[in-house]
């Protein structure tokens, strides 16, 4: 049985069956994981920007 874009052999079978999920669910979770990672990065950058703004205001006084 072929899975997604894979061929016969060379690890494709493990890729297809190792998660126990169909391909569309596996790729959706990767998309969700990337979205969560980007949201965390956004939050960290916003917090860092606020620290920079506070430091600038402190130095202007």
Swiss-Prot record:
Known Pfam families for this protein?
DUF5320 (PF17253)
Q: Which residues form a coiled coil?
A: 24-60
Which InterPro entries does the entry link to?
DUF5320
Sorted alphabetically, the keyword list is: Coiled coil
Name of this chain's protein: Uncharacterized protein AF_0667
Q: Which species does this protein come from?
A: Archaeoglobus fulgidus (strain ATCC 49558 / DSM 4304 / JCM 9628 / NBRC 100126 / VC-16)
């Amino acid at each position: 049985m072929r899975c997604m874009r894979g061929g016969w052999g060379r690890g494709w079978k493990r890729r297809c069956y190792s998660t126990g999920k169909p391909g569309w669910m596996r790729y959706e979770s990767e998309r969700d994981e990337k979205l969560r990672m980007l949201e965390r990065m956004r939050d960290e950058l916003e917090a860092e920007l606020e620290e920079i703004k506070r430091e600038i205001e402190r130095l202007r006084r």
